Amino acid sequence: MSRKQLALLEPALVRQALMDAVKKLSPRVQWHNPVMFIVWIGSVVTTALAVAMATGHLAGDAGFTGTISVWLWFTVLFANVAEALAEGRSKAQANSLKGINKTAFARKLREPKYGAQMDHVPADELRKGDVVLVEAGDIIPCDGEVIEGGASVDESAITGESAPVIRESGGDFASVTGGTRILSDWLVVQCSVNPGETFLDRMIAMVEGAQRRKTPNEIALTILLVALTIVFLLATATLWPFSAYGGTAVSVTVLVALLVCLIPTTIGGLLSAIGVAGMSRMLGANVIATSGRAVEAAGDVDVLLLDKTGTITLGNRQASEFLPAPGVDEKTLADAAQLSSLADETPEGRSIVILAKQRFNLRQRDVQSLQATFVPFTAQTRMSGINIQDRMIRKGSVDAIRRHIEANNGHFPPEVDRLVENVARQGATPLVVAEGATVLGVIALKDIVKGGIKERFAQLRKMGIKTVMITGDNRLTAAAIAAEAGVDDFLSEATPEAKLALIRQYQAEGRLVAMTGDGTNDAPALAQADVAVAMNSGTQAAKEAGNMVDLDSNPTKLIEVVHIGKQMLMTRGSLTTFSIANDVAKYFAIIPAAFAATYPQLNALNVMHLHSPASAILSAVIFNALIIVFLIPLALKGVSYKPLTAAAMLRRNLWIYGLGGLVVPFIGIKIIDMLLTVFGLV
């Protein structure tokens, strides 16, 4: 669930934006936008000319020049309003996070375990590595990792989701965020950051920090717009001697009006707002982007690496069956499987313990009473287990257990290979259990592919985006689930090194790669990916490696992130097309008005039959200013997104924004000319 969306033009935001827009009229702000800086200079020049004419220091029509000057100032002001509105929406979203309750004191434990002696200390004195106890009703004082316990946590202040979530030690749900509230039970949390460096602090600082850095595409487009502006500036400058040679020199006011109408002021005025709004839309989707560069990269992504669990499948794999090896009875397998899972905090491990209880009433056992040593799972060994006196029980992937058996001079039965293959062909995950050098059998873990995911992948394929499923399952299981889900490719038995190598392989082919991750073992791949979305419930290392954080911790959000990125790029491209196409109509309005007296043949270009030269020039300038206002909602909201191929999308946008950019100015300028004439304003 996304946090509450702000109304597109909320009155309070508009009022603040208008005040900020006036402040942005300062030349120190305007020179950052070269196109609008030219308009600002034109406004200053025409204002000075109007004052000089009004005071009799210069011959000319002070009323006409003053009116042109006013509308040029409006053009700059409207561009400022667009940017201020976009920034205001982002700041309003960040301000809602400032209101999150923070605790004044924390229970700092002297030892990292429940029941240890504690000291009550100010929360702002906690440092990275400190361990605190939080109980029902407490506000978590720092970002950190749960090292003991489990509790229901209200994260609505951050995610906007009213339903509480479970945070517990072990697994993928061990990360907690400062400012969230414990609803039940207790947690022992190890702080992962120092004061002022929390996730909320960094997020607010990002939104409210210094001026936003332009993205590479934005810089490239700015260079294009500046080049066009220079071309039109030189062209306009040559018109004065050209007209003077013809006998009637064009006034500076008309030349300034012509220049402002020809340069791409529409996209120049909205470009910054589009970028800020893109980050704001990400925040509206509960995704925090560390920079506009990350949002832009999301729009260019053409390979998605998707974790199977939680993204493609529901992610709640449960033990469904014990399949013993030849010569082993099912209860013996269940007994060993349960023992190997007693200290396993993962949902899969707990489901194995429960299944053994249900099938064979195996109860009342724990690691401490058995004087056993738990062997945790690692991405390198790909197995876990337990050592009980002279018994060594392991469970894990087929390859991991095979290596373990061979290392202990044992034999891996071919019958177990067939069991594994049958489980995998059904789309379930096989876990092999062994004791010492003997294979006891296979545990089947069932998962379910999410509804509608196949259709979403088909849409991505139509857009030219390749989907790759990443899973730790064996090749047969991965192939079965990949076929059911409709992904383009898969990486089975994935290790952190394999993920990293796959990303580098795609990047070497010139592709941009996006992925999600939540564990410390995902950090290298997240750091390498072009778009890396870390889960808020994930580890601190994963969050620091990624360039986005999903507050909802929903891996499927990666697809929405790509949609928002593409929408931002489409909006920028569409409004650029519209802005450049606009110039044609303005050309037909101003050129005849400015030069028909010198060259009557140019009257043939007055296809709109505008009332007079003055009304034609003024109509074009007014339209040039007002079109920015009408396009502000589109810049903030983004153009309509449809999952089409690049060629189809280009054709669609050329028809809508290219043809629209040609037709709308002809209609708009003509209507403004008629209104000016009817009301006798020219």
Swiss-Prot record:
The active site is at residue 307. Keywords: ATP-binding, Cell inner membrane, Cell membrane, Ion transport, Magnesium, Membrane, Metal-binding, Nucleotide-binding, Phosphoprotein, Potassium, Potassium transport, Translocase, Transmembrane, Transmembrane helix, Transport. It comes from the Bacteria. It comes from Enterobacter sp. (strain 638). One of its GO terms (molecular function) is ATP binding. It is found in: Cell inner membrane. The chain crosses the membrane at residues 34-54, 62-82, 219-239, 254-274, 588-608, 616-636, 662-682. It catalyses: K(+)(out) + ATP + H2O = K(+)(in) + ADP + phosphate + H(+). HAMAP family: KdpB. The system is composed of three essential subunits: KdpA, KdpB and KdpC. The lineage of its organism: Bacteria, Pseudomonadati, Pseudomonadota, Gammaproteobacteria, Enterobacterales. It is an enzyme of class 7 (translocase). PROSITE patterns: ATPASE_E1_E2 (PS00154). One of its GO terms (cellular component) is plasma membrane. The keyword Calcium does not apply. Part of the high-affinity ATP-driven potassium transport (or Kdp) system, which catalyzes the hydrolysis of ATP coupled with the electrogenic transport of potassium into the cytoplasm. This subunit is responsible for energy coupling to the transport system and for the release of the potassium ions to the cytoplasm. Pfam families: E1-E2_ATPase (PF00122), Hydrolase (PF00702). Its EC number is 7.2.2.6. Mg(2+) binds at residues 518, 522. This is Potassium-transporting ATPase ATP-binding subunit. ATP binds at residues 344, 348, 377-384, 395. The keyword Cell inner membrane applies. The gene is kdpB. It is a multi-pass membrane protein. Belongs to the cation transport ATPase (P-type) (TC 3.A.3) family. Type IA subfamily.
